[in-house]
Amino acid sequence: MYNPFSIEGKKILVTGASSGIGMTTAIECSKMGAKLVITGRNQDRLSKTLSLMEGDGHIMIVADLSNDGDINRLVDECPVLDGLVNNAGLNQIITTQFITREKLATIMDVNTTAPILLFQRLIKKKKLIKGGSVVFSSSISGNFCVGLGNVMYSTSKAAVTGFVKNAALDMASRGIRVNAVAPGMIETHILDNSKIGVEELDADKQRYPMKRYGRPEEVAYGIIYLLSDASSFTTGSSLVIDGGFTLQ
């Protein structure tokens, strides 16, 4: 059956695959017949992701992408890829007056530096095919809107969006596309562990035109579109997935 949105048989590396959007993206890609390389820092949670994936031939590699040695090992152990989903991320609620060099370095390293270096080393080692697709997880925060306490997170994600545009230009002659997804608030287990109460979360959802947060699979579907040949003329873009929040 003709399906330009198919990713069947594509080899795709997903980082941050042990939870949240990364986990869901890996599972959804496997349902569509892709062959996954999944990575994350927590072996037990990564193993759970692997157990929920469909099909066979998937590879699990435990790695801490804030460590250059782990990045190099991951690249060496990866097969030649059709796609990369740079999804690993970190947030810390803090306002400007409480920023420290150490706190800023930590969040920038995880959200910005590590995914950039992973991409760069995959390119250098010729581990991405011509016609390949790279998707970075960015955010509406910092790019389209801001929020109290998001100063470091917004900065790191705005930097990712800037990198995506420049890298797309650099890679165009090689036939490699570079895009980003920019989600609004998404229902993940991170919210289960937050200090924000249910009533506060319900009130916050009312700020969204659709009166709810997004689901991880709704972001995964956007990522799959950008990985597929249906987006073959799309590069340097940020796909906003926010239930209309930034329209207000």
What are these regions, as identified by a protein language model?
Residues S139:
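Residue(s) in the substrate-gating loop at a strand-loop-helix junction
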Residues F119, S156, V164:
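Active-site helix of classical SDR
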Residues S18-G20:
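Conserved glycine-rich cofactor-binding loop
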Residues A172, R177, T234-G236:
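Short, small/polar-rich loop/turn modules that mediate ligand/substrate recognition or access, typified
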Residues K124, L169-D170, S232:
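Alpha-helical segment proximal to the catalytic Tyr-Lys
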Residues Y2-N3, I224, T235-Q248:
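Short C-terminal tail/terminal secondary-structure segment
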Residues T95-T96, K103-A105, D204:
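Substrate-binding pocket helix/loop in short-chain dehydrogenase/reductase
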